Structure formats: structure tokens, C-alpha cells
């Protein structure tokens, strides 16, 4: 009897172990729908079976000077990876489309902008500051999150040239089917405001 109970327990544990990754896979592959600056819906991570295409989200705030200073570098990186999709995500949930479009006119990033009023992409990536990058596979796996480079040492203090180009190196590694190295330090930048509850 005891041996039978042990066997049943082992079988159940094996079943849980097999089921676990399936549940995790489903959780990480949930589709995300946001809108671009023209009000058009954009769907991400719809294909759970495709791992070929990379999607890079750069989280920005219009009034963050560090974000705006990275425009030339981000345009350079974008041109270096023409097969990769780049988007800037306006992370402030209260930002209007008109405000985002105005910022887009003043700072030409060279790739599309997205509104994230419900902070779906913020939560999915775990981004906390701007500018911060998140790299996903097209099936919704987070492959990298962190700074663009280490140009900024602190607020108001930066190097002429970065010592580590973290985002660029991460993309190169991923495209070679290698794991990307995540920075030990969070990006220097502006904190992403959290969405307020409607009842507060």
C-alpha cells in the first residue's frame, strides 16, 4: 500500500513537471494589443510557433532628457539590424496621442511609436526606467532587458563614448543563437510612472 502511494505521488509529480512548462509557455505567449500614434491597433506575439523574428521595444518618456539624447544612437543601432523590428513605447499611461506625435516631430527616432496606456508592454517586459530596451522573440519570450549602453554614469554625468554597448551586443548574441548577457546595473534614466487605479 505504501509503495503504491509513493508510485502515485511520483507519477503526479512527473505530471506537474510536464504541465508546468506548458502553463508558463501559455503565460509568456499571451498576445498584446496596443495602438500606434495614428490610432491603429498593433498586435504582438500572435504566433506561438515562430521564434525567428526579433522585436525591440525602447521605452521612452517625452520629458526625459536622457531618452532624447539617445535618438542618434538608437537610429544607428536600428540601421545595423534591418531584419529586426524596432518600436519606441511611450510608457506614461496618461500621455495623449497628440503629445506623443508632437514629441515624434521634435525627435525623429527613425522607427514607429506606440502608446501603452494600460502598460501591457511595461508589465510584460518588466521595464522600470527610460530609456530601457526589451528584446522579445515573436512568440513572446523576453530575451533581453536593460540599458542601451553605459554612456551615462549618473544623472548629468556621461562618457564621451560608451564602454559597453549592451543592446547592440545582446542583439548580436541572440542572432547567433546565443544567450544575451543582461547588465548588472539598471539603466540611468527616468522612472516610468505607474498607472493609477481608476478608483483612487
Label each residue range with its predicted role.
Residues 48-68, 171:
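Short active-site neighborhood of thiol/selenol oxidoreductases, capturing the structured segment around
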Residues 32-55:
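A short beta-strand-turn-helix
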Residues 137-138, 142-200:
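Thiol-/selenol-based redox modules, centered on thioredoxin-like
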Residues 24-26:
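Boundary at the C-terminal end of the N-terminal hydrophobic targeting segment
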Residues 61-71, 93-94, 133, 190-193, ...:
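Short, thiol/selenol-centered motifs that function as redox-active sites or metal-ligating centers
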Residues 103-145:
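Short, internal strand/loop/helix patches
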Residues 9-21:
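Bacterial N-terminal signal peptides
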Amino acid at each position: 500500500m505504501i509503495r503504491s502511494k509513493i508510485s502515485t505521488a511520483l507519477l503526479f509529480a512527473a505530471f506537474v513537471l510536464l504541465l508546468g512548462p506548458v502553463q508558463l509557455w501559455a503565460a509568456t505567449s499571451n498576445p498584446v494589443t496596443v495602438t500606434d500614434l495614428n490610432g491603429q491597433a498593433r498586435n504582438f506575439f500572435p504566433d506561438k510557433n515562430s521564434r525567428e523574428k526579433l522585436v525591440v521595444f525602447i521605452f521612452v518618456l517625452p520629458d526625459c532628457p536622457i531618452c532624447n539624447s539617445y535618438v542618434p544612437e538608437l537610429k544607428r543601432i536600428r540601421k545595423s539590424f534591418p531584419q529586426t523590428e524596432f518600436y519606441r513605447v511611450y510608457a506614461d499611461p496618461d500621455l495623449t496621442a497628440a503629445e506623443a506625435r508632437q514629441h515624434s516631430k521634435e525627435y525623429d527616432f527613425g522607427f514607429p511609436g506606440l502608446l501603452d496606456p494600460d502598460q501591457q508592454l511595461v508589465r510584460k517586459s518588466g521595464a522600470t526606467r527610460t530609456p530601457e530596451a526589451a528584446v522579445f522573440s515573436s512568440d513572446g519570450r523576453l530575451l533581453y532587458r536593460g540599458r542601451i549602453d553605459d554612456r551615462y554614469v549618473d544623472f548629468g554625468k556621461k562618457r564621451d563614448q560608451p564602454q559597453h554597448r549592451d543592446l547592440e551586443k545582446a542583439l548580436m548574441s541572440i542572432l547567433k543563437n546565443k544567450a544575451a548577457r543582461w547588465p548588472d546595473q539598471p539603466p540611468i534614466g527616468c522612472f516610468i510612472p505607474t498607472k493609477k487605479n481608476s478608483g483612487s
